[in-house]
Amino acid sequence: EYIAFKNFASEVVLLDIKEGYAEGKAMDLMQCASLNGFDTKITGTTGDYSKTANSDICVITSGIPRKPGMTREELIGINAGIVKAVASSLIEHSPNTIIIVVSNPMDTMTYLAHKATGLPKNRIIGMGGALDSARFKYRLAEALGAPISDVDGMVSGGHSDKGMVPLTSHATRNSIKVTEFLTAERLDQVKEDTKVGGATLTKLLGTSAWYAPGAAVSGLVQAIACDQQKMFPCSTLLEGEYGLNDLCIGVPVILGKNGIEKIVEINLSDAEKAHMQESAEGVKKTNGLLEL
């Protein structure tokens, strides 16, 4: 929806295993075209990966969603098999594609996509940090009583309730550090509210959120498709960056036509470094449950 409404893609293909579902969604969206002023062609297919052939960018959202009370990690048993099969099928028909992984547990599913496809690290991207950062900025703006457009902030680390690392040392309001406006106690509350952002919505909705995740994905897709060279926090394979190796976890990256153009290493506070290490250990523990 967001990708079509932004009108930067010539074609979008929706694929689902539920008979007729993707076709119906595509038709419903296409009937918005004249009302919303976009020319993107949207089609749907039930399980026919040949319809996705030669895609520049593929987004994997496949798997079961969270239910109230579930952690993202509890989804691994079912979602790992699904993501592995989907990633392999996409690469078969679009060998030069860039893959964005949304399925949970997202960092582990991004790592699995690497292993299943053998693609270079710049072409496998996990979405989580972009969404978590949007939720962080929402909570910061709420605490500051400020417009969200005045606020900037980023979340690194794993895409899990315990693994997120909201970077308060880099959070600003109009380029002024938020520590000038908020007490340490208030900032701690902002961080906690950010970490449980997904769980809060799951409890309210009875399932996973969709508007903000969709907006986050469209931002990543647009940055790649339009070669914007924009910075987002994304899950990517680390090979020594931030002192971490052989795992996918959220860090700042530059996105452009080649996918991840650069991993950006920024200075973290001592507390943030410690939390990042703890987060990495949690991701590696979840990775250990994979049958590679």
Regions found by a protein language model. Give the residues of each.
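Short, well-ordered alpha-helices that flank and scaffold nucleotide-derived cofactor binding pockets
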Residues: 1-5, 27, 31, 88, ...
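Conserved S-adenosyl-L-methionine
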Residues: 5-11, 118-121
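Conserved N-terminal glycine/acidic-rich loop preference
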Residues: 21, 27-32, 56, 109-112, ...
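Rossmann-like NAD(P)-binding element
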Residues: 35-98
